[in-house]
Amino acid sequence: MPFREVLGRTGRVHTLSLPLRWSDFDMYGHVNNSAYLEFSQDSRVAFLKEMESIAGKGSVPQVFVRHAELDYRRGISPSSRTVTVNSEVTRIGRTSFGVRQLILDSDGIVCCEVKITQVAVDLRSSSPREITDSERQVLESMITRPVKEIERGQDNEPDIDQLVPPDSTE
């Protein structure tokens, strides 16, 4: 299952393993910076589809990306054949929600942190719209927060840095 519970936290983290393709590498043998954005996009699409498969068709808003921020921490190991992307909902607003992703190499080392703001849209008008109560309920079931912070009334973004790629048997 692509969703995993994280001990001591509410919500769930979505995990997706992606193969590295020849086209992901630049002429220097490094994974090109644009490939990280593709990994992020592929994982977000899978994340939304998985949420919808659990909660039902039409339960997740149609979205456009409003903002993307990538923090490249280190290059992906040249020996890596796959990357793992851990995705979590971090906040929910009136028309948008935040997703935080960690891209890990095959050794489980965090190589990039991605923060995305996605806006719910009316596809007919391509205009932002409010997240419905039922969509909000689905998104809230995915939001991850440390239980201790919730008990203290804090709402900081959780730290999923310690998640490792799932076993290949999952």
For each feature predicted by the language model, list its residue ranges.
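Terminal targeting signals and extreme-terminal segments of soluble enzymes
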Residues: M1-T84, T90-G98, L102-E170
